[in-house]
Swiss-Prot record:
The active site is at 72 (proton donor/acceptor), 184 (proton donor/acceptor). It catalyses: L-glutamate = D-glutamate. It holds the Pfam family Asp_Glu_race. This is Glutamate racemase. Belongs to the aspartate/glutamate racemases family. PANTHER family: GLUTAMATE RACEMASE (PTHR21198:SF2). One of its GO terms (biological process) is regulation of cell shape. PROSITE patterns: ASP_GLU_RACEMASE_1, ASP_GLU_RACEMASE_2. Its EC number is 5.1.1.3. It comes from Oceanobacillus iheyensis (strain DSM 14371 / CIP 107618 / JCM 11309 / KCTC 3954 / HTE831). GO terms for molecular function: glutamate racemase activity. Pathway: Cell wall biogenesis; peptidoglycan biosynthesis.
Length: 274
């Protein structure tokens, strides 16, 4: 079997990217690591996020990966440049693909972005969007309650609706916004509720599909696409509660996909300072 693609996230959110990678690249073998024990990354300092991200990368490098997908917006905002400079394998984040998808979607240049405190305060989405289209109008909103709620497995129902409605209240009077970027890979797990609260006139963008498409392009450019016809066996690791991780994974993946997975607990703590 060919080498695997490594995927990292602060928790279960990156599984939404993995799901799309499995759909678009069915021959590729994936190794996923979710740092659920230290989730969320959003309120943490840049230094902490950088340390935790490099610890995850270090773990995956021992698995001899051929490419890295940073399926965490906060980690992408704070560490992508360093990762690209220091690793000798292709690296992709989720912010640029999400920005490109939003530019394709908007008809009036009014784009909203929701994400963690870290992602929104970094201005990474505004910079990415404005680099593509200088006259874009970007409104950012941090939604701190979303990630902890998703990590508890609350993905729909009255609690999810109440939390999402309250968090998105600042956007309720913005009648011009026609596109909303889910600037955290946890948020697609709440997409139906977010769409309901925002209304059908707003296009809700998840970067997962675009990230998978750009991953495919990078594999092709670097000539590392898996050509084997063997059925891939994906490896998932979590630093946190294994049972909760498995239950959330079951809501994302079909039974046929689930039979192609092994899910284990990982200890990635290290004394090394990155």
């Amino acid at each position: 079997m060919d080498k695997s693609i490594g995927v990292i996230d602060s928790g279960v959110g990156g599984l939404t990217v993995v799901h799309e990678l499995m759909r678009q690249l069915p021959k590729e073998q994936l190794i996923y690591l979710g740092d659920t024990a230290r989730c969320p990354y959003g309120p943490r300092s840049k230094e902490e996020v950088r340390q935790f991200t490099w610890e995850m990368v270090d773990f995956l490098l021992t698995k001899n990966i051929k490419m890295l997908v940073v399926a965490c917006n906060t980690a992408t905002a704070f560490t992508l440049k360093d990762l690209k400079e220091q690793l000798d394998i292709p690296v992709i984040g989720v912010i640029q693909p999400g920005a490109r998808a939003a530019i394709k979607s908007t008809t009036n240049n009014q784009v909203g972005v929701i994400g963690t405190e870290g992602t929104i305060s970094s201005g990474a989405y505004s910079q990415a969007l404005e680099k593509i289209k200088s006259d874009i109008q970007v409104s950012g909103l941090a939604c701190p309650p979303f990630v902890p709620m998703v990590e508890r497995g609350v993905l729909s129902g009255p609690e999810a609706k109440a939390v999402v409605s309250e968090a998105l209240r600042p956007f309720s009077n913005n009648k011009e916004m026609d596109t909303l970027i889910l600037g955290c890979t946890h948020y697609p797990l709440l997409k139906s509720t977010i769409q309901e609260v925002m209304g059908e006139e707003v296009t809700v963008i998840s970067s997962s599909e675009e990230t998978a498409r750009e991953t495919s392009t990078l594999l092709d450019v670097h000539q590392i696409m898996n050509r084997s016809d063997l059925v891939p066996l994906h490896q998932f690791y979590t630093t946190g509660d294994l049972e909760i991780f498995i239950e959330i994974a079951k809501t994302i993946f079909q039974e046929s996909h689930f039979q192609m997975l092994t899910i284990k607990q990982a200890n990635i703590s290290t004394n090394k300072v990155w």
